[in-house]
Structures are given as C-alpha cells and as structure tokens.
Amino acid sequence: MTDTRNGEDNGKLLYCSFCGKSQHEVRKLIAGPSVFICDECVDLCNDIIREEVQEAQAESSAHKLPSPKEISGILDQYVIGQERAKKVLAVAVYNHYKRLNQRDKKNDDVELGKSNILLIGPTGSGKTLLAETLARLLNVPFTIADATTLTEAGYVGEDVENIIQKLLQKCDYDVEKAQMGIVYIDEIDKISRKSDNPSITRDVSGEGVQQALLKLIEGTVASVPPQGGRKHPQQEFLQVDTRNILFICGGAFSGLEKVIQNRSTRGGIGFNAEVRSKEEGKKVGESLREVEPDDLVKFGLIPEFVGRLPVLATLDELDEAALIQILTEPKNALTKQYAKLFEMEGVDLEFRTDALKSVARRALERKTGARGLRSILEGVLLDTMYEIPSQSDVSKVVIDESVIDGTSKPLLIYENSEPPAKVAPDA
C-alpha cells in the first residue's frame, strides 16, 4: 500500500514503509534501499527489543539461582557474624526459589510447600539488613512492613493488604513480579497477645492482626486497589496470589529468653533445690538458640501463626569485636561511607584503632547494637563536616579515642604545613 502511494506520488512525497505516515507527519524519515522508516517506528522497535531482552534476562536469572554457599558468601560481604542465621536463610531462600522453578513443570505429583522465615534477635543485630541483602542479591521485589502500624480491617490503621500494595509499588504494579517477591515484616513481636486469657475487649493490634496475617502468609488471593487508591465497592481490584511470596518476619522478642530459661531450668524448693548464682545465667543469644514453638506461644503468638513460620533463625548479640568489624569490614562499612564523603572534598579521613574501640563501647552502652553506630559517628563528625567545605587547605582528618570521648577535636592536617595542636572543645 505504501509502495503504491509512493509510486503514485513519483517520489515527491515520502511515506514510512511500516506505518504509512508521510514525511510531514513525523519528525524524521530514514531512507534505506527503496524503503523508509520514521522515528516513531524506530522507537517502537527499540521498545520491543528492550522488552524481549529484559524477559530473556529475567528467565536466565531465574535459572541461575546461586547455591546456598554462594548466598551465604554474598551475605558475608555485608553482614558481620550471625553465621547460623545466614546458613538458615540461605537454605530457606534457595529452596523457596527452587520450588518456584519447579511449579512450571507439568506431570509432577509432588507439590512443594512454602517455608516462611522467623528471625529472632536483639535490636541492631542485622535482621533487616539480612533481608534487604537477600532481596538485592536475588533481584526480586522487596518491601518492609512495620507490624506495629497494622490493625484489623475496619479499625484505624493499616490493613494487612497494605503490605501487598507496598510490594506492588516496588515493581510498578507488575502483578507477576510481585507474586515472586519477598516481604519483611518487622517488629512482629509487638503484635503478640496482650494476655493469655481471652478478654471481652478486642485486641485489634495484637491477636487480631495475627489472625488477619494468617491467610496472607499461608497463601491467598489478596484484593489490592490499583495505584494505591482507597477501597470502594465500584472499584476494580488487582488480584495478587500470595502463595509464592516469601514472608520473613523479624522481631527482638524482648523477654523471650526468660520464657526459655524458665522452661529449661529445673525448679525446686527446700534443701534439694539447685542453687544457681547470677553469673551462671546465659547470654540472651545463647538462650534464644534453644527457642521452641511452645515458647513463642507463651510469649503471645497464637499457635496457628507460629505454624506458618516453620523456618526459625536466631541472631546473637553483637559484642565489641563484632561492632568494630561492622565499622570497617563490610562493603558499605560506616567508616568507608564517611571516608567517601570526605574524599569528595579532597580530604582523607583516618580512624585510629582506639577510636573504633571507643565507638563500639559507646554503642554497647546504648544497647542499640549496630544501629547506634551511625548516630555516634554523626555526632562526632558533625562540626568537622560543617567546617571542611569552607577550608581548601585541609588534606587529612584524624579521629582518635579522645575525639570520641569528647575531650578534644579531630586532628586536622593541612597541606604544606605542620599540623596544629589539638584544641579542647568549647564548653
């Protein structure tokens, strides 16, 4: 058709050989051997090729699932310690995505079940970081939900379906991608039952939320408003099947170690009672390793909810040595991050060993784990980061223990000059 029109016009007016638009209807017309293509058709062809390449890459990445050892090795680059938790997570995630690859095969009588994960560990021990690193490694949609904001449907607060809505937002509302994603629900211990005895008052943010999460975690078809709109009866919903979404729940479970110790410690009174000193008490991390489902039920989780989280991983408390490693060794270690910030100003940043030890000790005193390290360094480096951009002759900043303790200012080394004496901070 286009060739005929071109022939009739005797070459005076040119047309795209693909869409038939004339040279006046498009911005650019590219000539080939007896054919023409417009800029719009070129863009369309590029989009088609790009989509096919992305689909092929997604399929190849799905088949190239890293082994548990490889997963654990990559986690080692970002998370210090917690070897047992890494091993449990690596095996669970590997089996989960192996199960997803298996579901496409027909004539298979064995149906593999889903194994969701429960992470138990003190605050700042690396629960959220482990989940984030896993999602980045596997290149799947990932979202973090806060269990403390969830309430039963009909009450003020977030419905459990909002979790799936957040997951959809992470993948531009691609339902197929979302159905293979990972959801991390933080502070799961905060929705424990407030009391062992049933009450006439509704526990809308405790046991009620656990009941609402049951079907979502096990596998159901959740109805989610498109593009984050509010629910109303005349609206069409996106249907998301949660059977293949991996749920990882994490919490500090403060006080759980006492429940475990009460179960594992022989009681007694009188002359035959076993006498124990305070020094014989176990560390929190050691006690948590002995956790059993009954302990979680006594803590306040309902038995059905515990049953939906068959894979259990406990994290240890971080000691001073581990905190120093966290400051220096991971790919995105805090000292490397601040060194990069100073490098952008053309300044070297050096942390002395005694300074790192002092930072770790202060974090232990605050009982915030690795999460408290950044706030300590921010406070220490605030004045220096304020002054450095205004000084062009500083070549190096040195931080030692006295700077962390607040008894002196950072040592500034200037270009082509002797370093100035330290000056005590202003009162």
UniProtKB/Swiss-Prot annotation:
Keywords: ATP-binding, Chaperone, Metal-binding, Nucleotide-binding, Zinc
Residues making up the signal peptide according to the UniProt record: none
Keyword field contains Zinc: yes
Residues given in the record as ATP binding sites: 122-129
Residues where Zn(2+) binds: 16, 19, 38, 41
GO molecular function, one term: ATP-dependent protein folding chaperone
A single BP term in Gene Ontology: proteolysis involved in protein catabolic process
All copies of domain ClpX-type ZB, residue ranges: 4-57
The keyword Nucleotide-binding is assigned to this record: yes
Pfam family name, one: AAA_2
Gene Ontology cellular-component terms listed: HslUV protease complex
Top-rank taxon: Bacteria
Family to which the UniProt record says this protein belongs: Belongs to the ClpX chaperone family.
The protein's role, per its UniProt record: ATP-dependent specificity component of the Clp protease. It directs the protease to specific substrates. Can perform chaperone functions in the absence of ClpP.
Subunit composition and interactions: Component of the ClpX-ClpP complex. Forms a hexameric ring that, in the presence of ATP, binds to fourteen ClpP subunits assembled into a disk-like structure with a central cavity, resembling the structure of eukaryotic proteasomes.
Descriptive protein name: ATP-dependent Clp protease ATP-binding subunit ClpX
Organism of derivation: Pseudomonas syringae pv. syringae (strain B728a)
